[in-house]
A protein has these predicted regions:
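Conserved G/P- and acidic residue-centered "switch" motifs that form tight phosphate/ATP-binding loops
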Residues: 283
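Short beta-alpha connecting loops at secondary-structure transitions
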Residues: 307-312
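Enzyme catalytic cores with a strong preference for nitrogen-chemistry domains
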Residues: 1-279, 290-304
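PAZ/PAZ-like end-binding module
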Residues: 287
């Protein structure tokens, strides 16, 4: 079994499975760590349109607090919507949602993030249609940005049981609105990256609109995962404020110049200044300042001679 095979591995695994609780059948994700099932999370939003008919078999996740189920390890296992908290790293708190949960108007991940989850894992079986990969990509990156979280999206691929549907295995790792890694469609590969949960926690403290952790209470399941040194696969740019060559740098720089020039244009127009005086030292900063002054005058429809450049001693 999965638990027996992973007992010695310090790896968190999220696996999909059907679970019977009471008289109902649920579409669920089990969180497994070192051979033990930490908890089972049922799917909240069940699609029943187009090619989907999940309500034929399953019922949505029950409202209210977590319950418990038996038969998935020793004793009772938590069942419901919950958080999983790393004891050694307070900023690493994760939660799970399933497929359609992300596509719903109010995703469970929003409540999880408000309650403290910095990483969301999503088990998905998103069918492949023309252009859908772009929409999925926008959903995942957008949700990670809105929630200031890391988002792991694992999609069904080749080998998935199917009739008239096709699954491409398009999987992604996003962080705070940026795509860190993704697999190509119909490729037998994995998406691997690192998520900076401490940076995410800092961003949430900085944003005054991000809610406090006690907005909605969830059962929190602790687990012990001591930090270990690993090889960094995530690229760290030397120029953190400028995109790398060939990935929108020209557009970014043009946008910077446009913002600064329009800001200066407003001040010149508001104060009624007849000229703009800029000191030129020979460095990059003063060169940019001169370009901004020239562009501002162009926006005002005034000649460049209204910019007075004064050379300064080195």
């Amino acid at each position: 079994s999965l638990c027996a095979q992973t007992r010695a591995l310090p790896v968190l695994i999220v696996a999909g499975l059907p679970v019977v609780s009471g008289a109902k059948l649920y579409n669920c994700a089990a969180v497994v760590y070192q051979g033990r099932v930490l908890g089972i999370v049922p799917k909240t939003h069940l699609p029943n349109y187009g090619e989907f008919y999940e309500r034929r078999w399953f019922v949505p996740a029950p409202d209210g607090s977590c319950g418990f189920v038996r038969g998935y390890g020793e004793g009772e296992v938590p069942f419901g919507r919950m958080l999983f908290q790393c004891e050694e790293l307070g900023e690493f708190c994760f939660a799970v949602e399933l497929c359609e949960d992300l596509w719903a108007p109010v995703a469970p991940s929003a409540a999880y993030a408000a309650a403290g989850a910095t990483v969301i894992a999503n088990l998905s079986a998103s069918v492949e249609t023309v252009g859908k990969d772009d929409y999925r990509r926008a959903l995942v990156t957008g949700q990670s940005g809105r929630l200031v979280c890391g988002y792991l999206y694992a999609n069904a691929g080749e080998g998935e049981s199917t009739t008239d549907l096709v699954f491409s295995g398009h999987s992604m790792i996003a962080e705070n609105g940026s795509m860190l890694a993704q697999t190509g469609r119909f490729e037998q590969t994995m998406a691997v990256s690192e998520i900076d949960v401490q940076r995410l926690a800092f961003e949430r403290r900085r944003l005054t609109t991000f809610p406090d952790r006690d907005v909605q209470a969830f059962l929190t399941v602790p687990f012990s995962m001591p930090p270990a040194e690993t090889k960094l696969t995530r690229p760290v740019p030397a120029l953190v404020f400028v995109p790398p060559e060939g990935s929108g740098r020209d557009r970014c720089c043009a946008g910077i110049l446009q913002v600064q020039a329009h800001g200066l244009k407003k001040r010149i127009d508001h104060t009624g200044a007849k000229t703009a005086v800029v000191g030129i030292s020979g460095g990059l900063d003063s060169a940019l300042a001169l370009l901004v002054c020239v562009r501002a005058m162009e926006l005002l429809g005034r000649p460049r001679t209204d910019v007075h450049a004064v050379t300064m001693p080195c």
